[in-house]
Amino acid sequence: MRVLGLDIGSRSVDAVWLEGGRPLDAAVADSGFDPQAAARAFIERGAHDFIVATGYGRHSARESFGCEVVTEIKAYATGAAVLFPQAASVLDIGGQDTKVIALGESGRVVDFEMNDK
């Protein structure tokens, strides 16, 4: 199954296409004034069976595109567990806030802290 993952942030929209849990391709676009338009451009590329969104605009994406949503915390933990199985933490410095996530075994979230800029 091919999955399109979208991180719809306040400054950029990041896309990754996965098959069997492995990355096939990735792209980034500026969010601009309409992050959903940037997300739509990635969706229109096709080549996916399923879409999941995270980030600042995830709920709008669910309304616009009917995709599944996950929190950024869960998305980061899952990604770290797949790409860096020994990772103990994740740091995200985003356009809206900064997050620090402590990971346990298999990418399980042990704790996290977040501050707004």
Model-derived segments and their meaning:
Residues 1-73:
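N-terminal glycine/serine-rich phosphate-binding loop of ATP-dependent small-molecule kinases
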